Amino acid sequence: DAERYKDSDVKRKELAELSVSMQSTYGKGKYCSPGLAKAMDRIETAEKKKPSRDRSDGCLPLGELSQVLEKSESWDERLEAWKGWRTISVPLRKPYQRFAELGNEGAREIGFRDLGALWRSKYDMTPEAFEADVERLWQEVKPLYDELHCYTRSRLQKRWGKDRIPDGAPIPAHLLGNMWAQQWGGVYPLVEPYPGQPSLDVTRGIQKKKLDARGMVKLGENFFTSLGMPALPQTFWERSLIEKPRDREVVCHASAWDLSYGNDVRIKMCTETTEDDLITIHHELGHNYYFTAYHQLPVLFQDGANDGFHEGIGDTLALSVTPEYLVKVGLLDKAPSNDKAELNVLMRRALDKVAFLPFGKLIDQWRWDVFSGKVGPERYNQAWWELVKTYQGVAPPVARTEAEFDPGAKYHVPANTPYMRYFLAHIYQFQFHRALCKAAGHTGPLHKCSIFGSRAAGDKMWAMLQMGASKPWPDAMEAISG
């Protein structure tokens, strides 16, 4: 037995080292291309910004490659940015294979069939029932996604030509304005239903108001306090990383942290003064306020009702960042006042929320298949692209082989963070939003509701947050939505 424990210790250490090394490889990832460095300088100049840094080494991190992918007018530059980022995940392929083996061993030691079954066991139902439930939810929202996909493809065909995007074919992955085609806000100018309506350019409003990163976080905090929730602790401002440090490499993927049992909450993100990051701030602060609400519960209950709740809370508040709210806080001149302008707002939301759903499901679908042995290491990439095509209707713009490891180009894979929470959060947040709008006394279309300033909505939300994980998640859902 002593031998077995020793062996387990060795493997635990190996697992931890693999995890750190994969995340480090991802965090330091850069792709070097003098052509793309020039493209990035050109994009910043076009946006009337001074180049944010010297790019004479020609190397670009993920954030800059993503900007080229979204903003360049050149098919080839977008393609190179897309391919370039996927060079950083190639070295992760072998470590990930070993990581999956060790993760499965650990799961089996505590009585689960594999690591995927362990992940699926955390939802107050059997792993099999959970998998079936997720598939049912996807089938319910799929018709809406299919319509959005069809409309978006037709607009992309107009821009890039039917020879490159034939009728009925999947959309090439580098054309949707996002490195993983997970949200499509980057193609909004191409798909805007009614051009010429008053601008909803919140990024411009942020920059016009000269809001810096800290000011944006203050604005997010102000939303929560308007609901009657406490201000963030002073330690939050002293210990958070809100801007990208100039003197060292960090993982820029935004995250929220709860670092003690004494309400030491923080965020870590490389904030840019953009609308996207304003929404991300609301999302991350949602985690922080959840941490704060349950920090006095016994340690075992210091968690969300399930991980989808944790991801959904900040997103629920972000649904209240309506044009009317943005006018109130001085980031928009005026709210849309006719049906056409309103449809533009809804299209923006669909590109963000509806477009995400299949991606939210497929990442864990791929990992469940890897952990269960249904997909062996010799088919990692092929199986990934089969799922992307099936769920998203998206295809790689160039042929991919098993020499690559494209799943590893998404942070949550090397970081071993389960992803189903984001799929669930995209469903839950609309249920939460509807319930809180009702509590706030809102009547009329839901997309026009902002709970900003409503103590009644805040009390309802806070009561649910304070439950933490002390009750099964259906009880927490009932507490907020009835």
Please provide the spans of the model-predicted regions:
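Auxiliary, metal-adjacent structural segments of Zn-dependent hydrolase domains
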Residues: 203-261
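Post-HExxH zinc-binding segment in Zn-dependent metallohydrolases
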Residues: 130, 134-144, 304-341, 345
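Catalytic Zn2+-binding segment of zinc metalloproteases
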Residues: 285-300, 317-324
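A well-structured
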Residues: 1-204, 435-436, 444, 450-458, ...
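Short helix/strand-bridging catalytic loops that position acidic/His residues to coordinate divalent metals
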Residues: 119-131, 267-271, 294-306
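C-terminal, non-catalytic "cap/extension" segments appended to globular domains
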Residues: 114-117, 127, 182, 186-201, ...
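Alpha-helical recognition segments enriched in aromatics with Gly/Pro capping
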Residues: 237-242, 261-263, 280, 284-294, ...
